[in-house]
Amino acid sequence: MNTLIAQIEKGKPFFEKISRNIYLRAIRDGFISAMPVILFSSIFLLIAYVPNIFGFTWPKGIENMLMTPYNYTMGIIGFLVAGTTAKSLTDSMNRQLEKTNQINFISTMLASMAGFLIMAADPAKEGGFLSAFMGTKGLLTAFIAAFITVNVYKICVKNNVTIRMPEEVPPNISQVFKDIFPFAFSIIILYAIQLAIKAVIGVNVAQSIGTLLAPLFSAADGYLGITIIFGAYALFWFVGIHGPSIVEPAIAAITYSNVELNAHLIHAGQHADKVITSGTQMFIVTMGGTGATLVVPFMFMWLCKSKRNKAIGRASVVPTFFGVNEPILFGAPIVLNPVFFIPFILAPIVNVWIFKFFVDTLGMNSFFANLPWTTPGPIGIVLGTGFAVLSFVLAALLILVDTVIYYPFVKVYDEQILAEEAEGKSSSDALKEKVAANFDTKKADAILEGAESKEEPATHAITEETNVLVLCAGGGTSGLLANALNKAAEEYGAPVKAAAGSYGAHREILDQYQLVILAPQVASNYEDMKAETDKLGIKLAKTEGAQYIGLTRDGKGALAFVEEQFKD
């Protein structure tokens, strides 16, 4: 097993490079920016159709009234994501350009959204245009519009293909003329693509993409497809790469499109049978976090005999219940631990197989509404599928199956830890032996040991108000450390204020902070982040797995870690 893990780890640099790809990141951040729209629209969808499960149907007029906010938000999500994706990609491009010669992100957003309309919205006979492909069906077209637009702007800006105005002209007026050429070139190129596709295939770009990729989408929804897609989530995470950063952008168009398709099927009184959805990923495959670890903290707490495992279980139960499972992943540890390789990969795959069986064979509706990712898995299953009776059975069955899968491996690992404790090894020594090969914890150990040996944390070096931003992939894990810092700062009177955020959504607020801390799941973005913080004179620190979990549990140590970053 160690040999297999070692072989997998050889590909880690390659996959980390993929996870930092600016185009994949633009897709991910574009969806994050549009998430309020997605979640808001789902509220009306649930109100409109959940009562159907209990035999109550709204009158047609009320149903149409409830669906109006959904149709005018989720129904144009492709149009909106064209803009948010362009904005995110523009931010990444600007970090490669001189500070005095930047791309105007507002202009790229407008050009991308206009270009998207050209490629996705056919003219209506009565005037105006049709909106059939402005929603999730147009997401891939939205990405194309954003990528082409921003690259056209980059070429124009780098080569000064602009209209230069006299210095006497106000900057805001000059910017308008500066953007004319790249805006025009972008629209012309996207329109030319639309004309070519229309001439060859007879339909617009968005419809042609949907037609061409329909067989791929269908294959992805099969057992082999879901095994590869969702098995990759866990495999990447196991070797220390944030799997969703690689997999989610690749399947985002499918997942959100399938949710809308399922909603339309429910609306038509038919069976919602599309399995690959955002709900499947959040509440089935990653129930309790990547690796389907919802049951693991409870098993550590109730079934393990070792003191260390019991303590880790107690500390991990609450965050894991809400999908934040880094405490158990790095605290046990599970990642890079040969004992847990099989269940960590197997449990998510078995979960999605069972879910597909319930949908395809037993006739349960799949997910037709988007919910916040922090919704506890069992609750998300019930809500996202419209309170179907089978959803309660499914949630209970998945918990049982995951317990059976993890049980023998938890017992084996507990025996290992018991043996270590019997030999007189401390918990920190045992943990270090498990993660030292892949997670550098020496600095953390020194900080934590120093913090434990003193009555008070050494916060005297920080005499002025210091704002700390902790970043992770989704904003959940970063909250653990931010809360620990704020509590310790209040207890010991340290002038430190911490906030949690998600990587990619930080750029508008970055200049408000004096220190940025990267959680382990986004530590691979250190070099990119350093380019941003160096420009603003902000300190930057990255953390490793066990180190990060240790800091979230030790406020004194966390304050000491912050102080350490300001020492010359």
UniProtKB/Swiss-Prot annotation:
One of its GO terms (biological process) is carbohydrate derivative transport. It holds the Pfam family PTS_IIB. Its EC number is 2.7.1.207. Induction: Induced by lactose, galactose and galactose-6-P. Repressed by glucose. One of its GO terms (molecular function) is kinase activity. The chain crosses the membrane at residues 30-50, 65-85, 103-123, 128-148, 183-203, 222-242, 246-266, 283-303, 339-359, 381-401. The modification Phosphocysteine is found at residue 472. Residues 8-409 form the PTS EIIC type-3 domain. The active site is at 472 (phosphocysteine intermediate). NCBIfam families: lac_pts_IIC, lacE, pts-lac. The phosphoenolpyruvate-dependent sugar phosphotransferase system (sugar PTS), a major carbohydrate active transport system, catalyzes the phosphorylation of incoming sugar substrates concomitantly with their translocation across the cell membrane. The enzyme II LacEF PTS system is involved in lactose transport. PANTHER family: PERMEASE IIC COMPONENT, PTHR33989. This is PTS system lactose-specific EIICB component.
